[in-house]
Every structure is written in C-alpha cells, then in structure tokens.
C-alpha cells in the first residue's frame, strides 16, 4: 500500500470529496507563500553577492590566479565541491563578471566547472548508500551516469558556447531591459541590504559570504516549495512504457528540472521507479541530458536580475551549447553513446582500483586546471 502512494505529477487528492473541491481550496497556499519568501531571499542574496564581489575584486585577483578560462573552470569545479551545489557557484560567477573580475569567457567556463562539481553530489549520495552496505554498482550507477553524461555534454558546450560568445551572435538577442524589474526590486531589497552594509558595516567579503549563505538556504527552500509528486499504482504501467522512448525522457527531464531547478531533485523522482525495476540505467541517460539544459533557469534569472547583458549572453551560450550537443547525440549517435556511457560506468564499478582512479581523477583535474 505504501508503494502505491508513490509520486504524481499532479498532487493526488486524499479522497473523492477532495477531488470535488474548488481549485483554490486545493492549492497549497503555504507553499506559494514559501516560494515568494524564497524568491525574495534569492534576490537579496544576489544583491549582497553583487555588492560584495565588487569589493572583493582586488582580493580575488591577488589571492587566486584566475588568469585564464582553465583557471576559472577549475575554480568553479572545486567551489561546487565545497558548497555541495552548482547554482550558488554559477551565481557567484555572474557577480564576478558584473564586478569586472573575470571576462565573459572565464564566466562561461566557471559555470561549466560548477556543473561538473554539482554532478559529484549525486555520486556522494551513492557512496553513503555503499557505506550502509548497499550494492556498490546499484548505488553508484546513477551518480556515475550523471557525472559521465554531464561531462560529455559540457565538452560539446565548451566548443559551441565559446564559438557563440566569440561570434557575437548572442549580442543580437535580448530578454528585455531589466531596468524596470531592477527598480522594483531595489525598493524591496535596498532597505534590508542596507542593514548589512550600513548598519552592520560588513566588509566586502562578509557581504559576499552572507549572500552565499542566503542563496544556499534559498535553493533548499525552493526544493520545499515543490508539489509532492507521486506515481500512483494505476499510472506505473503508462510511465514505464514512456521511459523506453529517448526523446520523451529527454523532454521529461527538461520539464521536471524546469520546475525543480535542480538535477539532483529531478533525478530523485526516478528512484522509486528504479527500485521497482521500471527504469533501467540506460533509460536515465536522455533524462539527464534534458535536465542539464533547464537546470540553468535559475542562473538565467540571476543574470536578468543583475541587468547585465553580458551575463545573459553567457548563460544563453551555456544552455544552447548543452542543448545542441544533446540533440546531436540523440539524433545521430544515441545508441553508441548509450553503450559507451554504460561501459564506462561498468568499468568504474567493477574493481576497487578503477573506482579509486576515477575518484582521484575528478579531484585532480580541477586542481590541474587551476594551476595551468
């Protein structure tokens, strides 16, 4: 009975009477209120990080050798390991760009690094299951697939996104002038941010760290705003038929992550189906591809709120780079790509030495990138 309660993409009614209630009575108003609070805190955090980043410019330039795009990629990668999340690091990259600390290309590679670092989170959760005595291959496969798919997509994105940024094509497009939005948010945010800047007299690094802490809290609150999605017993058969279509899984991954703004959260929705054998590892690959595109929605929102056209262009280059790479793979060589990814995951998990080499490499690579 517990299994039949599962996750629905619509909130299941408690009973027939609940289903007949008006829509406004079925809406979770506390979650809407929490979403509004989360959005306010997100804008406040971004404002504090932006103000802090401007004052941090000399410190970052003196203490960190962010001289090229490789350095910023490694920095973003390790930064995401430290905070166990990619979105705050991507937001930090945009505030660094806005402060003139790094260039658009460096911002682009720092965001790429943040995605690589964020992929480690799912892998880390898998390690916790292994320590609890679960099967190593089963526990680590989702995290390894996420890391592998994300890494391969980002390789394509580096090439395509860099070409887009250097060509200036994205400069012809605009999401509109953010000045009106900025003026509205200034009225709501400035009194609170002024407390940190003028009353508490926090230094630049303090403002940035407070903003980073608030934005980490914000993404946690965003997760709590999500509707409780379940898959009812009657829907399992229908869903299990859909998972064998790569394009549908790609679109599903894009849609779910668009709502959740987190790859790890959207992947967790598949866990009940995976445990019951309805979703195999190969079915998850196109889902992860789609998730890797729409996970940048929160970063795009941050770029718009900064009212910085270069920041918007950078995020658009990243999203288009990942999307074009994913579509090429899906339409041209998906089955070969699928076999290659599964073989790599199997190789990593079959021996302790292979797993150790993989773990060593994902920490060594960002360090080497920083030192280049």
Located regions from the model:
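Membrane-interface helix-loop-helix junctions at boundaries between adjacent transmembrane segments
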Residues: 104, 120-155, 165-180
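Membrane-interfacial helix-loop connectors
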Residues: 80-115, 126-132, 256-323
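Alpha-helical transmembrane segments of multi-pass membrane proteins, especially transporters
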Residues: 35, 39, 64, 68, ...
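C-terminal transmembrane helix pair
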Residues: 133-155, 296-372
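Hydrophobic core segments of alpha-helical transmembrane domains in multi-pass membrane transport
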Residues: 33-48, 75-77, 149-162, 207-223, ...
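Transmembrane helical cores of multi-pass ion-transport proteins
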Residues: 19-28, 52-79, 83, 88-100, ...
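Helix-loop-helix hairpins and the membrane-proximal interhelical loops
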Residues: 17-73, 191-250
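Intrinsically disordered, low-complexity non-transmembrane regions of multi-pass membrane transporters
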Residues: 1-33, 134-137, 169-199, 224-244, ...
